[in-house]
Each structure stands twice: as C-alpha cells, then as structure tokens.
A protein has these predicted regions:
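The feature captures the beta-strand-to-loop junction immediately N-terminal to the Walker
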Residues: 37-39
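Q-loop/switch helix immediately C-terminal to the Walker
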Residues: 88, 94-113
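Helix-to-loop junction immediately C-terminal to a conserved catalytic motif
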Residues: 52
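Conserved ABC transporter NBD signature motif
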Residues: 60-67, 80, 113
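Conserved structural motif at the start of ABC-family nucleotide-binding domains
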Residues: 2, 19-23
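ABC ATPase NBD coupling module
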Residues: 68-83
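Hydrophobic anchor residue at the start of the ABC signature
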Residues: 147
Length: 159
C-alpha cells in the first residue's frame, strides 16, 4: 500500500516559491491500478518523480507498506520495490528485447517468460523478442517494451 500524507513540492523561481503540489493526501491499496489525470503542468509527472525518489518533497511523508520512505533515495526506493517508467522510453543500441527483459528481471529468464511479458503489453512476442531496441521501433512499441521490463522486474509499485 502506498500512502502520501500532506505531500508538498515547490520550486523557487527568481521572485518566489511556486507550489506544484500542496498537502496531497492519497492512499493506494496494494494490487490496484490507478490513473492520475490532469492538465499539462498539473503536477502528474512531479508526483511520479516524488514517489520514485527522483525529486524530494518539500513537505509531508511517503509510506510504502507502512514504512516511511520519504528520505530514501531512488536506489533505496527501487530496492524497496518501486519501479519507474520514463515518459520517453530509453533506446539501447546493440541490445535485443530479450536481453533487455532479462536484465530488467535480474534473474535467468526463459524465452517463454519474456514472450509472456511482451504478450501482456499487447506485442506479438515472435515479432519482437529478437529485435534490437533502437530507432527502428516506434515510440509506442518502445513504451510497451519498457512496460514489459517493469513487469519483468516484479516490483510492488510501478509508476
């Protein structure tokens, strides 16, 4: 379960402090799929970065399964079971989709397991498993492959 208590984040510009997120309270139960929507510049990406540990809140607390992770860095949060998929998927020249999934899983991964992850994100595994992760893939294909790597990690919380 993820709990945000009075979470705030602000940035200093040349004149004043600008609050991006102010006193947000939110609880997300385990094994739930939640979508955060809002206008451009509304703080959605900032919220994701705060949870992942890429940004530090200016106030409030973040708890994962009852453990306060507010002061943990991005590596410690990843070790706690939080994974983060970037808005723009990373391209890896010279690495095939299967190898990327194997690296993401952190364990020996069979072709069958890798194909299952690709199928779960709507890709025909036989068409992608041996493809190189490069500019030949569309943005949508790359995003699906990135989500498959998040699934392969088997984390508690995927952002």
């Amino acid at each position: 379960m993820l709990t945000l208590e009075n979470l705030s984040f602000g940035v200093q510009d040349e004149k004043s402090q600008k609050e991006i997120i102010r006193n947000l309270n939110l609880t997300i139960e385990s094994n739930k799929f939640v979508v955060v929507t809002g206008p451009n510049g509304g703080g959605k990406s900032t919220l994701a970065k705060l949870i992942a540990g890429i940004e530090k809140p200016t106030g409030g607390r973040i708890q994962l399964d009852g453990v306060d992770i507010t002061e943990k860095n991005i590596t410690e949060r990843a070790q706690s079971g939080i994974s983060y998929a970037f808005q723009q998927p990373v391209r890896f020249k010279g690495i095939e989709v299967f190898d990327l999934l194997r690296l993401a899983s952190g364990k020996q991964l069979t072709i069958t397991d890798a194909c299952q992850y690709l199928s779960e994100v709507g890709l025909c595994a036989k068409d992608y498993i041996k493809r190189e992760v490069n500019d030949s893939l569309s943005g949508g294909e790359l995003k699906r492959i990135e989500i498959a790597t998040v699934l392969a990690r088997g984390t508690k919380l995927s952002i």
